[in-house]
Regions:
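N-terminal catalytic or cofactor-binding beta/alpha core of small enzyme domains
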Residues: 1-173
């Protein structure tokens, strides 16, 4: 189910409440994507913003504009904590949902699936930001990711980051 910013804010606050109730040791954000492809920069931009603003040592951010996380290197991530709650963040394509919408899925995500890449699902939940249309064609999808609207993705990433940063203020790890 896709969500407006208000709905995303509500749903993400429910996630933080669940993390508080279950007593996880750490909160880890895996921000997937690359700054080399505009449409795939949603995760790294969020990672960059979170890294600059998160001061709690129990909240870790993996993946940003300098250190990209992708379907190849994701399997090498080490959490170095006992019982983390992992939130993966990535760009997504959709043939029915307009770019600029966001949704939370209650399972991990498989990075690179829009380009038929094989990887292991990662995360307790995932935040997916729709950045372009899914054409059901590898070549067209790659083209859509390369030519996505940078201003939309930058604004979109900043708004989602702001909601995340406001919500994690209520985290009790």
């Amino acid at each position: 189910k896709y969500q407006s910013y208000a709905n995303f804010n509500f749903e993400f606050n429910k996630v933080i409440k669940r993390v508080n109730e279950k007593r996880y040791s750490d909160l880890i954000f895996i921000c997937i994507g690359t700054n080399k492809i505009v449409g795939d920069s949603f995760g790294p931009i969020i990672g960059e913003i979170l890294k600059r603003n998160v001061k709690d040592r129990k909240i870790k951010v993996i993946g940003d504009l300098t250190n990209n996380i992708n379907s190849k290197n994701i399997k090498n991530i080490k959490y170095n904590c006992d019982n983390p709650y992992v939130i993966s963040i990535d760009s997504a394509l959709s043939d029915t949902i307009e770019p600029g919408n966001v949704f939370i899925i209650k399972k991990g995500l498989v990075p690179g699936s829009a380009l038929n890449k094989k990887a292991t699902a990662i995360g307790n939940i995932a935040i997916k930001g729709i950045v372009a249309k899914d054409e059901k064609s590898l070549i067209k999808n790659y083209y859509n990711l390369k030519n996505a609207d940078y201003k939309l993705i930058l604004k979109f990433s900043k708004n989602i980051s702001k909601i995340i940063l406001q919500s994690i203020k209520f985290l009790n790890l």
